[in-house]
Amino acid sequence: GSNRTVLLRNERFDLEQQVAAGGASAADHVEFTVPAARADEFPVGTYDVAVELIMPDESDPRQSNHLGMVIAPNITSLPASVARDGNGDAQISISFTPELRAGQQVSLLLGNEEVLPESFTAPTSTLTFIARDTEAGNRLARLRIDGVDSPIVDRSMDPPTFFNLRIDIT
């Protein structure tokens, strides 16, 4: 069909957004990308997704069935290493997209350790975490917002590879 539009609804934030379908869309699938300029309009969370399109020889749009989709946080800036202070605390500042909204729960996972952020004002796309009395070592870092973890695998590569989201705590 033509005039394909992807409809996204996030009930928690009472959001309804539309994104033009593009890419290699075909009769059996649709591809779309949230435009970078609009990333903050799509908070991390679960979305109900449908496609609206006009079928050949028809003038009224039809809507597909609805499917679930998750938008995950993406770490955009992470220090390669941080030094612990005299108490064994490591301060880690990160940047990410999309912005954290008021009411969302957030933590930084460092290996098996979950660290809560220092105080912040939402919306924000940067946070500081202090891993208290933490051990030295090279840790895999993930950002968790409302139970959704930032990806650690780059599935655009063949074969898939791990993102280099590690922090060396000294």
Regions found by a protein language model. Give the residues of each.
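Immunoglobulin-like IPT/TIG beta-sandwich domains and homologous Ig-like subdomains
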Residues: 1-58, 86-149
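Short beta-strand elements
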Residues: 59-76, 149-170
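Short beta-strand segments of immunoglobulin-like
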Residues: 78-86
